[in-house]
Amino acid sequence: MPQPPLPTLVRDLVRLVVTVMDEIRPRLLQAALSGERSESRNHRHADNFLSQHDLWMHERYRELLSKIIPSYVYASEEADPQIIGDDPDPDLCVLVDPLDTSELAVRALYGYTHVLVYSRQLARPIAAVVGDIFHHVQIYLAARDTTGGEHAFALTRDGTPHPLHLTRTVPLSQALVTNYLMKPAERFHPLTQQTRLLQELGQLSPEGGRRGRLGVDFGSVGLCHIAAGFTDAMIEFAKGFAIWDLAPGHYILNAANGVVLDLQGQPIPLDYRFDTVTDIGKAMNQRRTFIAASSLPLAETILHTLQKT
């Protein structure tokens, strides 16, 4: 069955994100090879690495977004929400994480960039693009079409689209479960305390091998990897993700028929309560724990193994 064409907005967003990635990639490679990481003091998020590249991308996104969206609320990780354009109360809010995993991006290892467009009138996202700066699978996207249906795709560097729609489930003992475990005290140590989860992942399969795996993943792209079928689940139970880390991947995974639950087992809604600019600012200061998975049975199984920390 043919799918409706993607809306102009998301096609424009894809071109915009690819442009920004093409511009920043050589700068990041030069930073990695030279060792000049251009780190800046992070006044907004003291525990997070911040480079001049993050700030440059923040400004570049604002410049380019203003060419395709006349009026919007610009909600970037790197600044307070700001109204752009002539409309004093625009419908659209554009949520941006200019450079996710920047401490690895300046080492030319991993780097991602997130854009989500949210309709305050509809109280839900209408488009999201997650870009992978260094890999061949370059873009993950989701968009709402004119009929109200939602579709998710991955695009390779040559522009080939791959529809994303999850229909399978795997038992936890055969799943690849990821977690952002890079920070030893805040994230890795709490993960080591999840003994039931680790035991379930280490169970023997019917064929006799141990097929469960635990991996590392990052921000929204971790949920996109589930949407594409590359991984099976992602968990965040320690510190929680900020909305710019979670929301774009949440929308893409939801459009691909995946699930995102809170730690009480309830689906996390796509209504982010962006009713006013003040509300957007409040949402930017909150964090959410979650279980994201390719299927509800897998998410619920993981939930039952997690121990309160």
Which stretches of residues belong to each language-model region?
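Glycine-rich active-site/cofactor-binding loop and its immediate structural neighborhood
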Residues: P90-V129
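General beta-strand structural signal in soluble alpha/beta enzymes
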Residues: V73-E77, A105, G212-D217
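Short, Asp-centered acidic motifs that coordinate Mg2+ and/or phosphate
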Residues: V73, A127, D232-A233
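Acidic beta-strand-loop-alpha-helix segment within the catalytic core
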Residues: T113-L223, V277-T309
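N-terminal subdomain of lithium-sensitive/metallo-dependent phosphomonoesterases centered on the IMPase/IPPase/PAP
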Residues: M1-L99, L303-K308
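Oxyanion/phosphate-interacting regions
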Residues: M1-S34, Q194-R196, Q203-T309
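Residue-level signal for inorganic ion chemistry
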Residues: I24, D54, L65, A142, ...
